[in-house]
């Protein structure tokens, strides 16, 4: 199978930190030892998400493990964000392999993360499950749109993976001080509230993306005009 047969999708990222992050990643990629390649970074990202989930689960009995979760989130950012940049800087792009492996790893990573949160006591298992379903549904939509429209969207509403990691890290550190939040006179788990808000945001994003992409595809491939009556 020739790589020339594959048309790589146009990457679109409008997140708040895109330009700053790109400069940082290029700086890091140009300074990594030659023996480190993009596959090493991808596997590091997967291991980091596994350890993030383990850290959350340990935090049920050892709250300071939340600090470890934040550290592993940072390691995940390093591996997940840098693997593609390193491949492009060195001219070692593998468009099909990279796209497939990167996003399979992402799916397992989110599963590890939310499983850890479900076991942590800081997020209800039902909330974690709902958030996982919403994430997977939006991911499926993004992958289908990438195939059909050859546009790969890396962010929505100014948020991409990096911004989401930052929000999660800040929320995780906040758990050390108070794992609950007061809403309308009732106390709720902070990560239950955050998880429900994230699920709602993903669901709204999914609906908006589906409507936009169905419209674009219909305009590109409309039904043939009906023959006039009597002809």
Where are these regions (language model features)?
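Hydrophobic alpha-helical transmembrane segments
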Residues: 1-71, 115-231
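Acidic (Asp/Glu-rich) catalytic motifs at the cytosolic membrane interface
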Residues: 71-115, 141-145, 211-215
